[in-house]
Amino acid sequence: MKTIDLNDWTIFSSRPGSDNYYNEDQTMMLKVFKLVDESILPNLEREMAVSKLVSGLGIRTPEVGDIYQTPDGHYCITYEAIKNKKSLSRAISEDFSLAEPYMELMANAAKLIHGTKCTSDIVPDYKDLFVKGLGEEPRVSEKKRADIIKKLEAFPDEGCCLHGDFHPGNFIISDGTVYAIDLVGFTKGHYMYDVGMFYFLACVLPGKAQESIFHMNHKQAGQMWKLFVKYYFEGSEPDLKDLCDYAFMNMMTHREMVLIPVMINLSLMGFPPFPRKAF
């Protein structure tokens, strides 16, 4: 594998799982993963393949380059650098008057993604990911696992493209153009899988978590969600139970969530597994 020297790059942002760098003339971005473990290589290779696939579908995303490794063992991916860009959540947190126009832009980008059918074998079905996550979750009994899978089978299959980590922090804007980023979780299935995740992050998580994700408080995140609903659903309101069910499935593929046992019990009893409602 090709190596890369970080002395030739300048860090410009840090996220929980990676640090981001620019080259000298800021034409390329380097995403350096914090975990030093070759087990992440398949995910990196998949992220590269998915980025190329997504571009071919007409969904705007920075052009992907190649995989490298630093001398101390960190894996990296190069991307086209989008100049003068900000994530939608960062821009809104700095000027909340941008919330409405930017949520309209995000809703339009989401409609393009969700309106695109995905038949590629490199993109997994969200139900398969859910079942895998459920099987690896030690806090779920065999009986509950069987009950949840039975419930899962009743969910519709649509086969549309899904971002997989859908929230305003994973959409950037530059000169009025919106790009989708961080596509390692890209999958296919029902659009509510994505929408439910945004609901969970904006309206369910406590304020401290939202400050970390969105750079804003719980109330502002809820207002942002409501504006997204306005433009994505065009006047109608999503069903709260549906949002919760799909968010539950998404969170099961991100199994570090400590709320999973409570979510499982409430979901099986037929109740929305989250205590808070959308603003």
For each predicted feature, which ranges?
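ATP-binding glycine-rich phosphate-binding loop
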Residues: K2-E24
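An alpha-helical support segment within catalytic cores of ATP-dependent transferases
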Residues: K2, G115-G164, P168-G169, S174
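Conserved kinase catalytic-core helix
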Residues: K85-P124, R145, L152
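Short beta-strand micro-motifs within the conserved protein kinase catalytic domain, predominantly
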Residues: E63-Y75
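The N-lobe alphaC helix and its flanking beta3-alphaC-beta4 segment of protein kinase-like domains
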Residues: P42-V54
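ATP-binding glycine-rich loop module of kinase domains
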Residues: G17-L44
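Active-site activation/catalytic loop segments of kinase-like enzymes and analogous catalytic loops
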Residues: V195-G235, M249-L266
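Short pocket-lining segment of the protein kinase catalytic domain that shapes the ATP-binding cleft
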Residues: I77-K85
